[in-house]
């Protein structure tokens, strides 16, 4: 992992990823029983969130993570900043660097935006840490980390587990990051989607590809359902919403085909009735709300790793 950045799941070795997951658990434990959820870990640090796409879970969890670690958290959005007046992303980034930001957390519709931000602000390796909170259809590494943490908590481990990812793989930054991270952690990954929703070159990914959802269910340890990202489409990817749901939706019938220990995940937002029914989403096998809770502690661990370092995480978490 690049010490000052988290731009892609490929930045993470198995040791890096495991350390972040372990530290996420430590930070969560350190907060148990506190009337005021505050740790002094990042006191005096300034964290800036830069969200150029709509977000609820990711934006809020990064803000909460920073505040629970006593960082000063500042929000920048296109609507409420000079971006709305035409300022470029580069100029905004350089302005925030000059203002003394210690970390920049960016979500942007353009793939590669986080990498560019790191280049622009880190010319002399003394700029702010950059964390990718989702860039176009490219990647979303912290989502993959919180998914991995949830799987580990539910199943007791990730090594050797069979994880089935279903839906709009083509447009999903979550799928890309999860495939890389889960493979790094020793899981077997299966991608299930219609041919039209699979990216070119997917056969080169460390995953098996299937078009038959039912066939993959009996051996699945976890099923990660993905929303169809209609906002990134011009139509024509499948005949109808109803047909898509019939073939690739996680219904009660399909849930009954899963092993009893299997866990159901969804990165959100969910489109109930399309890729997942309400009864499945709200069932005991569903870990959707656990994912949200884990998002805060994972992002606490990521902020700590890029701003301070892993060596004192246990000591800081207990402070």
Curated annotation (Swiss-Prot):
Q: Where is it found, in Gene Ontology cellular component terms?
A: cytosol; peptidoglycan-based cell wall; plasma membrane
Q: Which InterPro entries match?
A: Asp/Orn_carbamoyltranf_P-bd (IPR006132), Asp/Orn_carbamoylTrfase (IPR006130), Asp/Orn_carbamoylTrfase_sf (IPR036901), Asp_carbamoyltransf (IPR002082), Asp_carbamoyltransf_Asp/Orn-bd (IPR006131)
Give, as in the UniProt entry, the pathway in which the protein acts.
Pyrimidine metabolism; UMP biosynthesis via de novo pathway; (S)-dihydroorotate from bicarbonate: step 2/3
Top-level class of the enzyme under EC nomenclature: transferase
Please list the GO terms describing molecular function: amino acid binding; aspartate carbamoyltransferase activity
Q: Which keywords does this chain's UniProt record carry?
A: Pyrimidine biosynthesis, Transferase
One Pfam family for this entry, by name?
OTCace
Organism domain of life: Bacteria
Cite the binding residues for carbamoyl phosphate: 57-58, 107, 140, 143, 268-269
This entry's Enzyme Commission designation comes to 2.1.3.2
Task: Output the SUPFAM superfamilies linked to this UniProt entry.
Answer: Aspartate/ornithine carbamoyltransferase
List of residues binding L-aspartate: 85, 173, 227
Q: Which reaction does it catalyse?
A: carbamoyl phosphate + L-aspartate = N-carbamoyl-L-aspartate + phosphate + H(+)
Give one GO biological process term: amino acid metabolic process
Query: Quaternary structure per UniProt?
Result: Heterododecamer (2C3:3R2) of six catalytic PyrB chains organized as two trimers (C3), and six regulatory PyrI chains organized as three dimers (R2).
Further remark, if any? Answer: Was identified as a high-confidence drug target.
Q: According to its UniProt record, which protein family does this protein belong to?
A: Belongs to the aspartate/ornithine carbamoyltransferase superfamily. ATCase family.
Q: What does this protein do?
A: Catalyzes the condensation of carbamoyl phosphate and aspartate to form carbamoyl aspartate and inorganic phosphate, the committed step in the de novo pyrimidine nucleotide biosynthesis pathway.
| Protein name as it appears in the record | Aspartate carbamoyltransferase catalytic subunit
Q: Taxonomic lineage of this organism?
A: Bacteria, Bacillati, Actinomycetota, Actinomycetes, Mycobacteriales
